[in-house]
Amino acid sequence: MSDVLDRLAELLEQRKSADPQSSYVAKLYAKGTDAILKKIGEEATEAIIAAKDGDAEQIVYETADLWFHSLVMLANAGLGPQDVLRELARREGLSGLEEKASRPVE
């Protein structure tokens, strides 16, 4: 599975230098962080609605859109899916309460 994420992350990096007229992702990057975050909000809402409706096919479709745009956000911030996978691995085996207690105090 991470092969797909790795290939997608590589493509998203390449799109940073692409012409915004030639690529949807390049256009998102050109519009800036707020546009990317707005798109994530839209996709999250659509995923929630699909889940509420109980339509498995739409849940998968909308979650794929949400993941995709989250990967765009990560790439825009100089991060990638491996950063998230490392964090998930770090949390593996911890209870939710232990994980929360290990977070830095703000």
From Swiss-Prot:
TM spans (from-to): none
CDD domains: NTP-PPase_HisIE_like
Recorded superkingdom: Bacteria
Catalysed reactions, as listed in the record: 1-(5-phospho-beta-D-ribosyl)-ATP + H2O = 1-(5-phospho-beta-D-ribosyl)-5'-AMP + diphosphate + H(+)
A Pfam family assignment: PRA-PH
Gene3D superfamilies: MazG-like
Gene Ontology biological process terms in this record: L-histidine biosynthetic process
Enzyme class per UniProt: hydrolase
InterPro entries membership: HisE (IPR008179), PRib-ATP_PPHydrolase-like (IPR021130)
Keywords per UniProt: Amino-acid biosynthesis, ATP-binding, Cytoplasm, Histidine biosynthesis, Hydrolase, Nucleotide-binding
Gene Ontology cellular component terms for the protein in this record: cytoplasm
GO molecular function: ATP binding; phosphoribosyl-ATP diphosphatase activity
EC number: 3.6.1.31
Chief site of localization: cytoplasm
Pathway in which the depicted protein is active: Amino-acid biosynthesis; L-histidine biosynthesis; L-histidine from 5-phospho-alpha-D-ribose 1-diphosphate: step 2/9
Cellular localisation: Cytoplasm
Similarity remark: Belongs to the PRA-PH family.
HAMAP family per the UniProt record, alphabetical: HisE
Protein name: Phosphoribosyl-ATP pyrophosphatase
